[in-house]
Each structure stands twice: as structure tokens, then as C-alpha cells.
């Protein structure tokens, strides 16, 4: 294949969730993404949703997506090969598995892409296939075979669309060289090189590891003699992965639950037993773990929210500076209105990352992270590049220049610090060269930051909370 250029410009996107239209009516979500400043919407579609019986197509969910798109929007559809009748592992949801009949799968993909021709920019074949058992019930060679069929069908139906490799997740990026997860993706990258245009990476864990993660997946491709542009199909934080003490306690309870003998026909699943045990001893848990629980103390909930707001900014800026031009935040909102289950482990791990929530049947409740996302999107509107600037004698200082043609200069600045306690440290004053007439600064929460000028220099306080420094209107 010829070299492939990265998608032009910079776009911030949001994932709707993992089950759009599966457990309820497909409600509007693209206008909500647009209202936050997002210009890319990612959504999941399942084979069984679209083709519930052989040869019978139901376009309810697909048309609901298309009806919400404006010409200026970009759309990314993750197509999961989950079907009660067409896949090796009969399932309406997850894990996805290989098609029983490759030709039938190709026809399904062709019909789907033809229905959306010219409206969907990115088509993705399943999600995090190395997360076997949970998201993909198959092998790496089977994924490559399905990816190859998928890519051929997409390109025949809509030559202008791009194919995205199933996301390379934290299971790969956090594992050591030679791990099963890395071996899985290495096989896919080696043998599936002609079947995708963009490499999707999922950026969880420590935000400051993002440049290394992006370079790691690029190196994975270069080892096999090629390279594709990298996009971030998911990111957000904080997650439990960032707190070793919290993760150790969680793993201890998980191990106890999964190794305890089941008693009786109504024995509770081990994941729910784990959650029940955590709530039973909540008062003695480390605060870095308690803050992920439902109804945790308000001061811990507020601290988690502040960390989330900071990381919405830092994760994006670090990814963009690494040459990623599309970032997609996980996630917009709960899957359905009114669902609460504090023993749901996935909710514990990722539920608080949602930007919005329901008020009755409407997605109208904005969390603090949604405001942080909208604020960042406003600052980055029209941006076409981000680069890190050298900070002499301050290795803990992160300074980034944003290119915004026609909008004036913008820098984003913060200091490294402990993810949980860093906000307790006092800010430090820094100087920046600033040859512009005006100088204004606000932080990731929208609060004004005092700026003083000394000739061509400006001084302002910095901390773990990112600061936006700009010359004109924000």
C-alpha cells in the first residue's frame, strides 16, 4: 500500500458508549457531542442489530445515527461481529467472535457500508481484539482473516472511507515485551498490514506515558516495515490503573472472590462478590480506591472530578503533541436512563468517566468533565498542530505551543505531580517569553489565572492543573 496521510486538522471526539440502541430506543447523542465542541462521534453497531435474521435487515439504529449527522461532523462506526445466528459464539452483545460464513459476513458489511456511503468516515473492525474472552472470542489469525474481509468489503462499498484497526488497549500497552497481548497485536500488525488505514490506540493509565505509548505502537508497525497514522479511539482518566495501592487492594479482593468455592445454585458471580466486599470494608479502603465507589464521601468525589478535568486536557494535549490528530473521549453518557447498580464492576471501573447524565429520558446533565472538554475544544478550535517546548532546568514542567491559524498564540502549561495529592502542592511562578500585546490565562476549570508582564516576559503560577495562556479572546 502507498503511504497513508494522517487525517487533516485536529478533531476532538466522544464515544457514545458500547451498546447504542441495544437496550432501549436509540436516543439523540450527536447534538450533545456537538454542543460540547466535539466534531467526531464514535458509536458501536452490532451485526445482530442490523441483520437479526439471515437476509433481513433492520436499519433502525443505523438510520438513527445518520439522521443526526451534519456535513461538518465526522463519524466513526465500530462494527462488532456479534450475532445470535451468524457467529461462532452466538451472542447479541459481547464478546464478538469470528463469522461462521466469511461470505455472509462480507455481504453484511457491504450492505451496512453502502447504506452509510459518504456519511461515515471511519469503519472499525471490532474493538480491542487482544482482550480475548471479554471483547473478542477468537485468535489473532482469526481476527486478521476477519479484518481482511472487512477491509475489502468497506473499500468496495465506499472507497473514500478509512478502515481503523481494532483498538490497541491498556492490556497491550501495560504488558511487558513478549506478553500474550503484545504477541497478539504483533501478529495482527505483521499479517494485517494491508487491511487497515489507521491504527487506533487506547490511552488509559498515566497521562504522561502517552508519548511512549504512541511511539510503542509506531515501533510495532516499523518492525514490520511500514507505518500507519495513529488515532486515539479511547482515552480518559483517572482509572484504577493509575493508583498502585488501590489496585493492589482491588486485586486482593478479586483473587479472594474468584478462588472462593461457590456455594449453592444461587452463588453470586465473583465480580459482584468483589464489589460487595469492597463496599463492606469501604471505610478502611485507601482514598484513591474509595473515590471510584458510588456514594463515596463528597470531598473524594470532588477530588476525583478535579483529576478527571485535568486529565481531559493533559491526555489530549500529550496525544496531539505526539502527532495524533483524532482523539475520542470515553464516554458521553450511561448506556440507558436510570440504570444504577453499584455492584456492577464495569460501572465501578469506568462509570464515572461519563461526561453527561440523564435527567429523566434526556441527556441534559453536564458533569464537570464535560465543561472541561468543552473549554478545551473551544481553545483548540481551528488548531492544526501542537508541539512541546523545552523548559530549561524544569523537567517537571510541561509547556506546549498550539498552532491556531488566524486565532493567535496559545500555550498550555502544567507541572508533573502525584495524580492524587499533586493538587495539594502550592503553585510555583514561572516566566515565559511572550512578545504579544495581550496576555490572558485561565485554568482547566475556567478560573482566571493572574498574569504579570515584565517587558517581553510574562509571569504566572503553575501547578498540576493545566493553564491556557493566550493573547486575545479565548
Q: What role is predicted for each listed range?
A:
Residues 14-16, 43, 125, 131, ...:
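Conserved beta-strand positions
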Residues 36-56, 60-194:
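Substrate-binding cleft and catalytic face of glycoside hydrolase catalytic domains
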Residues 41, 69, 112, 123, ...:
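Conserved, mostly hydrophobic/aromatic
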Amino acid at each position: 500500500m502507498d503511504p497513508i496521510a494522517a487525517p487533516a486538522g485536529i478533531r476532538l471526539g466522544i464515544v457514545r458508549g458500547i451498546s447504542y440502541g441495544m437496550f432501549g430506543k436509540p436516543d439523540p447523542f450527536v447534538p450533545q457531542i456537538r454542543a460540547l465542541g466535539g466534531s467526531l462521534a464514535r458509536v458501536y453497531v452490532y451485526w445482530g442489530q442490523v441483520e437479526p435474521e439471515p437476509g433481513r435487515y433492520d436499519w433502525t439504529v443505523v438510520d438513527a445515527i445518520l439522521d443526526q449527522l451534519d456535513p461538518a461532523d465526522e463519524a466513526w462506526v465500530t462494527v462488532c461481529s456479534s450475532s445470535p445466528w451468524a457467529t461462532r459464539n452466538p451472542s447479541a452483545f459481547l464478546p464478538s467472535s469470528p463469522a461462521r460464513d466469511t461470505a455472509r459476513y462480507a455481504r453484511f458489511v457491504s450492505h451496512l457500508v453502502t447504506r452509510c456511503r459518504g456519511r461515515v468516515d471511519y469503519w472499525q473492525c471490532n474493538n480491542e481484539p487482544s482482550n480475548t474472552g471479554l471483547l473478542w472470542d477468537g485468535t489473532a489469525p482469526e481476527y486478521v482473516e476477519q479484518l481482511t474481509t472487512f477491509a475489502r468489503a468497506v473499500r468496495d462499498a465506499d472507497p473514500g472511507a478509512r478502515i481503523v484497526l481494532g483498538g490497541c488497549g491498556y492490556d497491550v500497552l501495560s504488558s511487558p515485551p513478549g506478553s500474550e497481548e503484545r504477541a497478539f497485536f504483533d501478529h495482527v500488525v505483521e499479517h494485517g498490514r494491508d487491511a487497515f488505514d489507521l491504527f487506533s490506540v487506547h490511552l488509559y493509565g498515566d497521562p504522561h506515558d502517552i508519548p511512549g505509548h504512541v511511539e510503542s505502537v509506531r515501533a510495532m508497525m516499523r518492525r514490520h516495515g511500514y507505518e500507519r497514522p495513529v488515532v486515539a479511539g479511547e482515552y480518559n482518566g483517572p482509572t484504577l490503573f493509575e493508583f498502585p495501592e488501590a489496585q493492589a487492594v482491588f486485586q486482593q479482593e478479586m483473587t479472594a472472590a474468584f478462588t472462593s468455592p461457590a456455594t449453592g445454585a444461587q452463588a453470586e458471580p465473583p465480580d459482584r462478590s468483589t464489589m460487595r466486599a469492597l463496599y463492606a470494608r469501604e471505610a478502611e479502603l485507601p482514598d484513591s480506591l474509595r473515590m471510584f465507589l458510588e456514594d463515596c464521601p463528597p470531598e473524594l468525589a470532588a477530588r476525583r472530578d478535579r483529576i478527571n478535568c485535568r486529565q481531559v486536557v493533559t491526555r489530549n494535549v500529550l496525544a496531539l503533541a505526539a502527532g495524533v490528530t483524532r482523539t475520542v473521549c470515553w464516554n458521553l453518557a450511561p448506556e440507558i436512563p436510570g440504570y444504577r447498580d453499584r455492584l456492577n464492576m464495569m460501572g465501578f471501573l469506568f462509570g464515572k468517566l461519563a461526561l453527561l447524565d440523564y435527567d429523566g429520558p434526556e441527556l441534559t446533565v453536564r458533569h464537570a468533565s464535560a465543561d472541561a472538554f468543552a473549554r478545551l475544544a473551544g481553545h483548540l478550535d481551528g488548531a492544526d498542530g501542537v508541539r512541546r517546548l523545552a523548559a530549561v532546568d524544569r523537567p517537571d514542567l510541561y509547556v506546549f505551543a498550539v498552532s491556531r491559524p488566524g486565532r493567535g498564540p496559545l500555550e498550555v502549561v502544567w507541572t508533573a505531580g502525584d495524580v492524587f495529592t499533586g493538587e495539594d502542592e502550592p503553585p510555583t511562578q514561572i516566566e515565559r517569553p511572550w512578545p504579544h500585546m495581550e496576555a490572558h490565562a485561565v485554568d482547566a476549570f475556567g478560573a482566571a489565572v493572574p498574569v504579570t508582564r515584565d517587558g517581553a516576559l510574562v509571569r504566572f503560577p503553575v501547578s498540576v492543573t493545566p493553564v491556557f495562556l493566550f493573547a486575545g479572546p479565548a
